[in-house]
Amino acid sequence: MGLSLTVKEPVGISCLEKSDKHCHFISRAREGDSFYIRREAISCPLARFYLGIENPNVKSLAKTLVGWDDSHDEDTAVRYLKSAPRLENCPGYIVYFPYPHENLKPDVIIRIGSPGDIMGLIQRFSCLTGARVEASLSGIGAACGECTAYPLATGKENVSLGCYGSRPGMGLNQGELLLAFPSGSRMVEVCALE
């Protein structure tokens, strides 16, 4: 799937006028839909944090993580949130689409595959570049943090196992992993060789 964050309202593509979780929007793109949303349509507070949609009260979000059983206590949740690469300010619109798409250019690309598929892509990437993919994962905020904010904030590739929200939210099957990378990554070249 491809995602693009843009200041200008997209033309030639429909606006989805509903609020939902970022991972659910990605799932729609996985199913073949191309659309955009206004950034305010992201309903998940953790996705809003990662994508820079609002400047949240970290203590309040820490309480949410504890309530979701994603943190042992609030202090640990605050440490987790402060350690996370995130976007500072999300532009007004997010575009979701199947990738590749002839008319839409992504800022970040998310691939879903088996461990063998993802391993093959990473091996070819390392063979081509001499670089390793250094994954940053936590099992918390996977689609929003690990697969969208991380590649955009760091300019690096990332592997994710998903999380308790994104695995069902994106319809991930048992054994499927996520590989995310910015559009400027040489991983684009690797994927084109498939």
Model regions and ranges:
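Acidic, serine/proline-rich low-complexity intrinsically disordered regions
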Residues: 1-194
